[in-house]
Each structure stands twice: as structure tokens, then as C-alpha cells.
Amino acid sequence: MMSHAVCRLLMAVSVVLFGQATRAAEPPAARPQLPLRLAAPVRPKQLPLSPPSPPFRYTEATHGAGSLKYVGEIPVFTLQGTPEQIGEQTAVLAKEVLPPLLETPKRIIQQFGLNYDLLRPIATAAATSMIGHSPERFRAEMDSLAKYTNADASLLYVANSLTELRRIGGCSAFLVTPDRTATGEMMFGRNFDFPTFGVLDRYSCVMIVRPEGKHAFASIAVPGLTGVISGMNDAGLALATLDVYASRDGSSMFDMNGAPLALTYRQMLEECETVEEARALLEKTPRTTWMNLACCDRNRAVIFEITPKKVGVRDPEGDILRCTNHFMLPDLAVGVRCERFKTLGHLVDFKAGEKFTLEEVHRCMHSVHQSELTFQTMIFEPASLKVHVAFGPGPCTQKPLQVIELADRFAGK
């Protein structure tokens, strides 16, 4: 248990990070809405940007039961076995990128003018405490990764636990239920909008993870992120997290007595098959902060509106579900001013009940990109176990999507 003084100091730090980012994230002035096409973007938030990253290509390799291969321009890791084996495979296959990636928490803290050396021991103590609320296997995987990277494991604890402190992301999600898609199956579009700090866009990848005795899943991430921020498992359960900046329920913005949400989301993919099972796990796990979680299985789509106090469930508006960076449920919402949310609504109106193709979902995601911040975009198809992805310097929504067929990969074929 951490001392009250340490808790107060960490909370003060979180308020500094949260306050600056919230001011940066004020929505832009209203602009005319555009029809469903490759439209000009909504003006991006005034968030801290990063210089363009130079091109990078991973070295294809195998290690034990793990491998790193390319599908088109997309690097795909396959990791399997025990937590220790998965950690070792990640460390060896991603050895050239882990050192700069592990510097990212430091860069984020310094971005706000804070003293990293002063805060690191506090952040490490908090992260270690929070990880104690998650399954032990996740810490074992991080410890193994650190061992074979010759890195300090505390860097991984912080990277996977204290992302809840930052509020510098945007992100958008657009889910179309089977009755409104041309294919008759769920489609789940998602943009990940975040400053790249010169590394996140360069090293983005698809990670196919086959944990011993658990559901296999795909995570769209970077090496070293043991938790999940965007992913889908072999049962067709898909999810993606989106920052939230305010809540009406009186809950604290940050509760250190919760489990890191990214690790909880991974646990959901490893242990759950349906939205209802995911909800049950989320409700029984202590939560750290405010967050939206877009989630669907093959038949149902919801937004979990998460606070340390409760888990709200928002259902589709008709056959469509849109989500950005605010709550919508009456007991949680604190005003809706996001232009991206409004743009997605206008695009739905423009379709006037017609069915969406995959290309049109892609165009919807392009219509709400945030310029340099949008360095990952994807569309999940849970029924056919496919993910269509594009990475790279933003806006990556203007790039063609590469399909990754997941069924055989999940089965180890």
C-alpha cells in the first residue's frame, strides 16, 4: 500500500497532465459537414505533435515458437506459449526497437515540462501497486521481456500501467451492426490518434498472441505494450479504448487502487467471447479512470462508459454506434462538443438507411482523422476474423488498408 503523501503527489501530477491536455483538447469551431467521401479532415486539436518519423522496416526473423513476418507493408508478430516464452520472443524479435520505445513514458512526462527523474520512482511504485490488481501472468511476461532486453522491468510497468494519467489522445470509433453492412457482418472502424513522439508510427505492428490455455488474440500496438488498446480475439470479440475528459458521476479522474485498464482489456480478450462476458469482467475488476471502450462481438456492439465508480453501457443509435472522447449516458455526460462525433452522425444521415461497405467505413474514418495524430487506422470484421489496417505518418487514413486474415493465425496454421 502506498503512503498518503505519495498518493497525493501522484494525483497532483495527474491533474497537471490532465489539465494541460484538456485545455489542448478543446474542440474546434463548427465547420460545414461533408458527405460520405474522402473528405477534408476535421481541424485537428491543438495537441503536441512530433516531427515526421524516418522510414523503418523490421528485420524478419523467428525465435522459438515466435516469428516476425510482413504481410504487405504491415509487420506481424506471432507470439505463443507461456508468459515467459511470450516475453522472450518479444524481446528477441523486437530487440532493435524496444530501447527507443521504452523511452516513450519519459518523453510524455517531459512533454508537459515535468521532471522525469523526480517522478519516476513515484510512478514506478504506483505502477507496481496497480499491476497487483491484474493477473500475475502479465507481470511475468513483462519481467521476461525485461530480462531478455537487459532493460529495467519498471519501465514496462510504467508504460503498461500509467497510460491512464495522460489525456493527449483523440481517437474515433464507428461500429456498424450486421443489418446495416453490405456483407451482413459487424464492421468496427477505429482511428488511434496520439502524438507519435517520433517512434509510435514507425514501430506500429500487428501482434498475434496465442497464450497457453487462453483465447488467441490480435493486438494493434507496438512491442512492449503488454496490455491492449485495440484488438480482437479468436471468438470475434473486438475492442478499442478512447480517452474521456470529464464525468458527471463525481468519480475521481484517477484511482490508483484499480487495475491498469490496458491489462484488463487484454484479460477480456484472453478470457471472454461475448460483450456480456466482457461486461461482467469489466464490472468486477477495479478501474482506474474515465474511459470509453468500444466493444463488439459478432452480433452486438456497445460502448462501455467506464469510471472508477461504474460501468455504463451505451447501445447503438439504430444500427450504428459512434464514439469519440466523451460520455453520452445522461448520468455521465458533461456536454457533447466534439466535431468528430457530429461528423460521423452527419455521414450516417447522408447514407439514409443504406448499407455500408467496408470502403465506406474506411471513408468515414478518414473524414474524422486528426492529421499527424492519426497514425493507426483499422476496421475489424469479427465474423470472418479479419482486420484491415494502415499505419504510418498521419493521416494514415489516406493510405490503402492491408487485410490481415486472422483465423488461421489464431489456430496456429
Regions found by a protein language model. Give the residues of each.
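N-terminal secretory signal peptides that target proteins for export/translocation
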Residues: 1-5
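Gly/Pro-rich turn-and-neighbor structural signature
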Residues: 145-189
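C-terminal, well-structured catalytic/ligand-binding subdomain of enzymes
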Residues: 27-148, 178-187, 191-413
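Bacterial N-terminal signal peptides
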Residues: 8-18
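Alpha-helical interaction segments
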Residues: 7-8, 128
